[in-house]
Amino acid sequence: SLVEVMDRCSSPMGARMLRTWLSMPVMDLQELESRYAVVQHFIDNRDDLMRLQTMIGDIGDLERIISRAAAGKIMPREVMQLRRGLSQTEPIMKLCGGKGVEALDELISKMGDCAELLEYLGRTMHPETASQLGKGDVIAAGVNEELDELRRIARHGKDYLLEVQQREIERTGIPSLKIGFNNVFGYYLEVRNTHKESVPEEWIRKQTLVNAERYITEELKEYEQKILGAEERIYAIEVQIYAELVAKIQANIAMIQKNCRILSHLDVLSGFADLAISN
């Protein structure tokens, strides 16, 4: 078909725009001349053409991702694809702008600035994000203090308990002190009878054994509550932050869609240049 012959686009977005152009040919002479000027520029500057096609190829199908964002159905890895795609915007603007081609400059001047959104996405999303919420880390470290602490507790609980144990040994001077757990009253500090006189006043005695006493502290009770509900709370926090992130993307949809149209335009015209060179 004619589309198959002419399609040298580097992205699905460009391929869709090409089909639209072929099904509804433009009749405006000025628009045709503008398109031709851009095509001729890339025919004459083949290094720029190859670089542009590579960049556009790396963008992927931003239109599809944005449509999912608008519906609130965008998945975490699609957010990362969106970020990777948008990150090509500035290099493309630098590559194509200031070349002395009025039509090209006009296209580039209409592109929106993605820097703020890119910075936000990069700061908020985990660099190796899970495929969906609840299946691993989605939100980056450093975004939410409670989330960071809960992750540390959930994944390094034993290390944390050893830290508490060592700290209390040093503080009280009780070398045999150890931390344990049972289903009756949770985490406890166990002290042998020979050292029970060294127990701090704020410790609460919970159980007396033949040779030892067991105590609880406010710190251990707080830790217990955190670790037992850590995964559930981690999920809740990530859901909340991710919803805010999706809302941020949705607030920028108009700008992203405009950029997609311009990138599609460049994709089609660079494809025409590629076709002209090879034929």
In which residue ranges do the predicted regions lie?
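Alpha-helical coupling/stalk and coiled-coil linker elements that connect catalytic or binding modules
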Residues: 1-279
